[in-house]
C-alpha cells in the first residue's frame, strides 16, 4: 500500500473524529472522537516518518500515545464523577462549575 493511501486514511479518520466532536453532545462519544483524532495524527506522523526514512515521527507518535493513555485515565475519571453526580453523560448537563 502506498504512503498516499495512509495519508488519505489519516485525513478521513481525523475528519470523522472532528465531526464527532462537533456534532455529538455525549461526553464519552466526544472523548472517543478526540482519541480518534489523536490516532489519525499518529498515523500521519508514522507515514511521514516512513516516507522520509527517519524515526522522528515514530518517536513523536509513541510519546503521543503515552500522553493519550494518561488523558484517557484522567478523562474517564472526570466523566465518571460527572455521571455519578448528574446521572447524565451529556456535555450540556455538566455545569458543575456554577455550584
UniProtKB/Swiss-Prot annotation:
Topology in the lipid bilayer: Multi-pass membrane protein
Known catalytic reactions: a quinone + NADH + 5 H(+)(in) = a quinol + NAD(+) + 4 H(+)(out)
Record's subcellular location: Cell membrane
Cellular component terms (Gene Ontology): NADH dehydrogenase complex; plasma membrane
Tree of life domain: Bacteria
UniProt keyword list: Cell membrane, Membrane, NAD, Quinone, Translocase, Transmembrane, Transmembrane helix, Transport
Cytoplasm as UniProt keyword: no
UniProt KW Oxidoreductase keyword: no
GO BP terms in the entry: ATP synthesis coupled electron transport
Membrane-crossing residue ranges in chain numbering: 3-23, 28-48, 59-79
Disulphide bridges: none
E.C. number(s) listed in UniProt: 7.1.1.-
EC class name: translocase
Gene Ontology MF annotations: NADH:ubiquinone reductase (non-electrogenic) activity; quinone binding
Pfam families: Oxidored_q2
Assigned protein family: Belongs to the complex I subunit 4L family.
Quaternary structure annotation from Swiss-Prot or TrEMBL: NDH-1 is composed of 14 different subunits. Subunits NuoA, H, J, K, L, M, N constitute the membrane sector of the complex.
PANTHER family per UniProt: NADH DEHYDROGENASE SUBUNIT 4L-RELATED, NADH-UBIQUINONE OXIDOREDUCTASE SUBUNIT ND4L
Functional note: NDH-1 shuttles electrons from NADH, via FMN and iron-sulfur (Fe-S) centers, to quinones in the respiratory chain. The immediate electron acceptor for the enzyme in this species is believed to be a menaquinone. Couples the redox reaction to proton translocation (for every two electrons transferred, four hydrogen ions are translocated across the cytoplasmic membrane), and thus conserves the redox energy in a proton gradient.
Name of the protein this chain belongs to: NADH-quinone oxidoreductase subunit K
Protein species of origin: Mycolicibacterium vanbaalenii (strain DSM 7251 / JCM 13017 / BCRC 16820 / KCTC 9966 / NRRL B-24157 / PYR-1)
Gene: nuoK
